[in-house]
Amino acid sequence: MDLNTLPFHSINSVNVSSAPTVNERSYPFLLDASAGVSGFNPVVSSPEKKARMKYKKNSTSPNMDVKSRKKVSRACDFCRQKKIRCDMDQSPRPGNACINCRKHHLDCNFTRTPLKRGPAKGFNRNADEKQKRASGSAKSSSPAVNGSVFSGNEASPSSRAPSITPVDSVNTTTSAIQVPSVTLTAPAPLGVDQKISQDQKPDSWLTYNAQFAQNSPQLAPSIPSPMKLSPANQQAMPPYPQMLGPGSISSYTNSNLGPSAGFRPPTFFSSPSPQPYSGPILASTAPTLDGSYLSNPSNSNPAVMSLSSNFPSPPKPNNPVYLPPRGNPTVNDRVSNVLPSITSFDSSVTTVPSNSPATLNSYTTSVPSGMSRHPMLMNPSTPEPSLGVNSPSLRPLQSLNNVQNSYRVASTQAPPPHPLRNYTSDAESISMRSKSTQASDAATFREVEQLYQENVEWDDAAIDRYYLLIHSTLPILHHSKARLKSELEKAPINLRSSCLHAIYSLVNRPPFATLGHVFHNTPMKAIGLLNLICSNVQDLSNRILHLQTMILLAIESDQRGPTTITGRNGLPQGMWLGAAIGLACNMRLHIQSHLSLQSINEDMDSDEALCRRAWWVLVVLDRWHSMSTCSPLFLPETFINLTIQDQKLLGTFPSQLVRLSLIVGHISDVFQSPDPTDRQSPIVTQQLRSEIDAFRQSVDVVWGQMNLLTLAVTHVKVLLELCINARPSTVLVPAMKMATILSSSSTPMTPLNHHFFSLATCVLIGVFDLPELQNEARRGLEHIRECIEKRRDIVSREDHEDWDYIVLKLINAKMQGMPINSDPSIPPHVPPSSAFAYSNQEMDSATFKDAYLYTRLCNLGYLGFLI
């Protein structure tokens, strides 16, 4: 039977398995009668079947197909934050919570609003607070026109300089107005007749276009007719205006916008461009939109002129301030060519009075009448002036320096004072002092010039005194006198002069000079400058000679007296030691060099031997300087290793002195330890005592023949007893032994004798007030005074204040019953930063009766104790 001949109601009863149903197809189609194939019979859809299919598609019953359903469940706040599955498949109800919230005893809340384009990536913490913070920061970062509520043509005082808000920060969600024309954003004019309400958006920017201007009754009177744009001229406009910048007024005034050229945005929104300097610019004059600043108002755009006419004109400055150009100074600008003088960095030099003639330091230049020119201060600490005279950045500086207005200096006034200079009321005394200082400096430079050109002669007597008094203790120069003379002859003239002057100044002064020799007349400042300007020291022999000269100057500075510590009489010893040690390390002398005994026996004055001897002399001087002044060590223990070759190279007493100096360095470390309890530590005490005992056992063979070595060992023992704060009777025994040895005629003169005298005097003065030890202490002080007076009559002058003079002065005061340091003041060489801690430090003393004297000894050293 043909399918087409069947009745209509019997079509549904035919079972065609291969024919796809309408539900399985994604779109309806038309069947072609001629496109039939075997096994395929098209199905004709009926209206009932279509209605049943439509009802099944739109059904929301739970028995419907899963694929056709949409996801309606969402997670709660806790599950979203933890990124776990939430079993709340339906909308949240009060009193109902998911399993996770019930487990943690939390409220199941659904505060997050689902987004249109799908769920967010995780839980956004504090979304409301972040949104409020972002909106608040956007409002605060966009400077709107101050004083937006006004009436008529009167603007508020704060709105005279309107600021421009960036276009990106404006919320342009005005979808209600559909305008096809291009919009132009510009600052709101200040001459609007009606009051602008606060709820208008945007508040500080107005969107101008032709259709909006016609439909707005409030803004139509304020917008001129040229603001209407034609479609032909809209393409030449930039999409956004630029920020206001300097140097753009000229480009705006030179623009000639005719009617045929179409409307162009104001060029005062263009970015700044570099302009050539054509003259001074008023600092207080800001670029504004006032028409009075235009060079040719007739050539400018009338639209912009009408828009800018509503802006108030800025006030004219009463006292304009001219700033110098920031680029290259002009040739005619005398202020830019002024160079700083040497006295501008001197704290003792005052400023030049206003009625004095113009000098390099007066900063007075010729400027136009009625105007003041800002001086270009050459001091590094002077800040760079800003554009505004009353800028907030200048107010803290002016209040700090008590300068009324340092950036409005008239041509008839004196320059502002430097903040680092100390001024006094007596200007004449300061000027006289500065003149005397300049005269002394000029004399010093003249002497340096003479020394630089002078060929110093060889003095055999002075060289012999060096080998007798210095070289036997500290072998600095060559062992051979002839070898030294030949090396000096080959050296450059300035280096040779510096070395010979250093030798003569050391041996021709107390306590080494005799009555028949006068002091060396050349000042040490000149010798030091001559040594510092020495050139042509690239050769190894010249560098060794330069190092030896610095060591000699360090010893001479130590012998000069207490005035060198305070800086009143030349450079201190620490300065020369630091320079010499720096040069030695630059020469790589701290690296251990292995010298064979054969090479030492063949040549004791080779370059390698001289370098090793100079290194060990620096080690000795560094240890004794650190202990005597409580200064840190320059050379660490890691670069010190005394070998048999070094002992052979140095000699008997210098090698033993090096070993003893290492113990002095250990005691100095204990004295300067940050923890004062280290001095009473039994382990530290036992270690130091074992080092001294080991040294004594190694020199027992020659102990009775070397009086100077006995004195040095006793000196170290006194330092140890003071370090551990021993009882007064224990410290008095080695101190009395030192006084006895010093008064002996067999004790030679060495560069370390003033150390022995000073330490013994400090201990005897400290225990003098104890009744049970006063007689013995008095006897020791008399021995030291007799020795000093006898030697001072031979080698010293009455007006020369060396170490012997200071020791003798203290002994006489104590013997006459005068109180010493009963209420002492802070020594002059103690810095002000540590003076408070020094004066208030409390330290228990079992050695001295006065605990303050013991504190003074521990903080300043035995040489600083005498000052």
Swiss-Prot record:
A GO molecular-function descriptor: DNA-binding transcription factor activity, RNA polymerase II-specific
Domain of life: Eukaryota
GO cellular component annotations of the record: nucleus
Location of the protein in the cell: Nucleus
Transcription regulation among keywords: yes
Region Disordered, annotated ranges: 110-167, 217-257
UniProt entry tagged with the keyword Transcription: yes
PANTHER family noted in UniProt: GLUCOSE TRANSPORT TRANSCRIPTION REGULATOR RGT1-RELATED, GLUCOSE TRANSPORT TRANSCRIPTION REGULATOR RGT1-RELATED-RELATED
Protein name: Uncharacterized transcriptional regulatory protein C320.03
Organism: Schizosaccharomyces pombe (strain 972 / ATCC 24843) (Fission yeast)
